[in-house]
Amino acid sequence: MAESSNISVTGIGPVKPEQAAPLFLMRDPVIFPYSLTPLLVDEENLAALRQTMERDRLLAIFPELPGDEELGVLPLQVTLKLFNYREKRRSGVGILVRVVKELNFPDGSVRILVRGLKRIFCHAIETAGGVPSARYVICNESASENEDTENKARQKSAVAAFQELAGAMPGIPEELQVAVLNAESPGRLADLISDALNLNYAEKILLLSMTDVRRRF
């Protein structure tokens, strides 16, 4: 029988989670939708990886929160949704990822390449057979935001600022610059830029936790 530990996440209204994915425990990096990220799989996460590779290749990631000193760089009015699991504070807003590739090395280490899919809210953690899984709901962005004139102005300003930054920092990949220029969705644009910017860990967790697209610009 699965052992269930319900986690209350405030501010998201009534939820009826119908989806679950193996829980991948990690601190960093912060993964955003659309991004491709390599990860080292430690012993703690190996069972979760094996389980998902036999199914749909989906993993749920809720980043570990940094200490209070690092969180102190965030604006005072910010309140992060969080929960405690295995004596660690974790963000209540995480990311659903798909495993694109698994690589096994001669030294026994395992690395995976994952693609960020959607922001998700954690509703509960369940453990069955020693493998934790997260019950979650997908954070849906309001369609009206895509038609908002003010939001489109923010998009234009963000693209211009990113182009200026890319000109001063040659290390930004050309394919990322092309993706930013052609991003039709304000949410996708904000996430592409957030992933590319050299922000600290706490700031990236804050951006991941923002389900209102307008706040990300």
Task: Give the residues covered by each predicted segment.
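N-terminal low-complexity, acidic/polar interaction/targeting segments
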Residues: 2-217
